[in-house]
């Protein structure tokens, strides 16, 4: 099976690409997913990863992949062109509400307080999804392993007793690419009411990209049918990778290839269904 997006020959010619076996889609119930994986991982440096991201790839730890599903093209890679971005009135309110948070940028590292917040977040937001049972090793493999230029950003309250850090509210992992920032993963305090940490985090990344002279913030995949991904459509303008080209995306009007239900919902090998 071939995809409409063709990989450039250089600097990716040293890599090999293979398709995974089918597995249950984690975004759309009842769908079957596959990924295309770039290997070997030790050859994927920041320059090569930049080219891979522009071709629709993402990473989880040192695992670099993009959707490669039979009969489904629901996952659309998206990015925000920071020079053209204009925050909405709601986003300006969110920025003002959380602007007192103090952001500290550091290399990837393990911190017990971060891990505890991650587990609270998973238990509250994604209970039963598997990640709410992640061990420390799984957490580190997922978020703290990287062979590229990655950073950990923690957001804390400004007010704290003298000599003590403010309360931890949010942690974000980002990759610094040749042409932008790539948002890897963000988790935050789930018990805080009337907050918009996720949106604030993207606004913060947009401001950081501007200050670094980088033109884009890559947000991963937007999926029209997935409520988890709906927030990405609130950033305007938004560009999507469609038919191998980045173009301005109108989430309400974009025409995506129809899903081949017979393929997208085919049973997994061994008689397992794609639901879950």
UniProtKB/Swiss-Prot annotation:
Signal peptide: none annotated. Pfam families: ATE_C, ATE_N. It comes from the Bacteria. Keywords: Acyltransferase, Cytoplasm, Transferase. Its EC number is 2.3.2.29. GO terms for biological process: ubiquitin-dependent protein catabolic process via the N-end rule pathway. It is an enzyme of class 2 (transferase). InterPro entries: Acyl_CoA_acyltransferase (IPR016181), Asp_Glu_LeuTrfase (IPR017138), N-end_Aminoacyl_Trfase (IPR030700), N-end_Aminoacyl_Trfase_C (IPR007472), N-end_Aminoacyl_Trfase_N (IPR007471). It catalyses: N-terminal L-glutamyl-[protein] + L-leucyl-tRNA(Leu) = N-terminal L-leucyl-L-glutamyl-[protein] + tRNA(Leu) + H(+); N-terminal L-aspartyl-[protein] + L-leucyl-tRNA(Leu) = N-terminal L-leucyl-L-aspartyl-[protein] + tRNA(Leu) + H(+). Transmembrane segments: none annotated. One of its GO terms (molecular function) is leucyl-tRNA--protein transferase activity. GO terms for cellular component: cytoplasm. It is found in: Cytoplasm. The keyword Glycoprotein does not apply. Functions in the N-end rule pathway of protein degradation where it conjugates Leu from its aminoacyl-tRNA to the N-termini of proteins containing an N-terminal aspartate or glutamate. Belongs to the R-transferase family. Bpt subfamily. This is Aspartate/glutamate leucyltransferase. It comes from Burkholderia ambifaria (strain ATCC BAA-244 / DSM 16087 / CCUG 44356 / LMG 19182 / AMMD) (Burkholderia cepacia (strain AMMD)). The gene is bpt.
């Amino acid at each position: 099976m071939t995809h409409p997006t063709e990989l450039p020959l250089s600097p990716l010619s040293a890599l090999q690409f293979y398709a995974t076996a089918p597995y249950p889609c984690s975004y759309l119930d009842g769908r079957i997913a596959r990924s295309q994986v770039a290997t070997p991982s030790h050859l994927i440096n920041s320059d090569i990863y930049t080219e891979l991201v522009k071709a629709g790839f993402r990473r989880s730890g040192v695992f670099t992949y993009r959707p490669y599903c039979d009969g489904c093209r629901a996952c659309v890679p998206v990015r925000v062109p920071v020079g053209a971005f204009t925050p909405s009135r709601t986003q300006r309110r969110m920025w003002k509400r959380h602007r007192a948070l103090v952001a500290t940028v550091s290399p990837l590292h393990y911190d017990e307080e971060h891990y505890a917040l991650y587990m609270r977040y998973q238990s509250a937001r994604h209970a039963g999804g598997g990640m709410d049972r992640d061990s420390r090793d799984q957490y580190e493999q997922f978020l703290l392993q990287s062979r590229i230029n990655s950073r950990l950003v923690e957001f804390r309250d400004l007010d704290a007793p003298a000599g003590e850090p403010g309360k931890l509210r949010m942690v974000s992992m980002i990759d610094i690419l040749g042409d932008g920032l790539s948002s890897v993963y963000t988790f935050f305090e789930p018990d805080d009411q009337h907050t918009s940490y996720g949106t604030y985090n993207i606004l913060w990344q947009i401001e950081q990209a501007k200050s670094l002279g980088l033109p884009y913030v890559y947000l991963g995949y937007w999926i029209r049918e997935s409520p988890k991904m709906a927030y990405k459509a609130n950033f305007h303008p938004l560009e999507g990778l469609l038919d191998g080209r980045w173009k301005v995306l109108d989430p309400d009007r974009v025409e995506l290839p129809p899903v081949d239900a017979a393929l997208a919902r085919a049973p997994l090998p061994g008689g397992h269904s794609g639901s879950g």
